[in-house]
């Protein structure tokens, strides 16, 4: 389970980012 406002993608949690910043989101997590 992820924190509110986060999404699960391939078993990982992501905050809502623009598609351009998904790479940054991966690094953040």
From Swiss-Prot:
Keyword Calcium: yes
Main localization of the protein described in the UniProt heading: secreted
Domain C-type lectin residue range list: 1-29
Source organism, top-level taxon: Eukaryota
Disulfide bonds: 2-13
Keywords: Blood coagulation cascade activating toxin, Calcium, Cell adhesion impairing toxin, Disulfide bond, Hemostasis impairing toxin, Prothrombin activator, Secreted, Toxin
Compartments, record wording: Secreted
GO cellular component: extracellular region
Single annotated GO MF: peptidase activator activity
Expressing tissues: Expressed by the venom gland.
Purpose: Multactivase, a carinactivase-like calcium-dependent prothrombin activator, activates prothrombin via recognition of the calcium ion bound conformation of its gamma-carboxyglutamic acid (GLA) domain, and the subsequent conversion of prothrombin to active thrombin is catalyzed by the catalytic subunit.
Subunit composition and interactions: Heterodimer of a metalloproteinase subunit and a regulatory subunit comprising two homologous polypeptides disulfide-linked.
Assigned protein family: Belongs to the snaclec family.
Protein name: Snaclec multactivase regulatory subunit
Organism for this UniProt entry: Echis multisquamatus (Central Asian sand viper)
């Amino acid at each position: 389970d992820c924190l509110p406002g986060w999404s699960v993608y391939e078993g990982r949690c992501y905050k809502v980012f623009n598609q351009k910043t998904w790479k940054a989101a991966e690094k953040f997590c």
